[in-house]
């Protein structure tokens, strides 16, 4: 009786041991596959968390309307654009390739932190769903391609509000194409496939925010 109990317990334990392995593999094989996935010791742990969130919290699609506070930003779009034009020339640029080795060197791709813009900063502080840490204005000057990629963690969603754009810049997600048109916004899961293509010599400016699920 005891031996049979131990054997059955051992079988159950082995089955449970496979659960986290399957959760990691599920996260790993999502396109586009990151071939450096297992070079980061923390990534498999994030993979388990990502898979758990997909089971519990993830939706097929995300809508800005379900996060009412974000409407405040869109309503203030004209003033946010005006503030950007006034304040940004007085600030130093931070280039993406200096903050993350994933980005290719590109002097036309940089950002300004949201905290440097008083109106924007005050609005953000009124919206509880926003994670203020990474809030920024992202600027692209000239043609550019961001190849297919995805964030390491799906803990946060990604919100974008286009401040400047003439329709020459497109964001592609697993839900289709979003054209960066002035005053238009989008909310998506940036831990899933997305890429970007900009074809003209003009400037595109987007407000980027991380959103709590």
Task: Describe each model-derived feature in a short phrase.
Residues 179-193:
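Conserved metal-binding segment of the jelly-roll/cupin
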Residues 164-182:
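A short beta-strand-loop-beta hairpin characteristic of the jelly-roll/cupin
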Residues 189-191, 205-212:
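C-terminal, beta-strand-rich globular interaction domains
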Residues 8-156, 166-169, 199, 203-208:
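Fe(II)/2-oxoglutarate oxygenase catalytic core
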Residues 161:
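Basic nucleic-acid-binding interfaces
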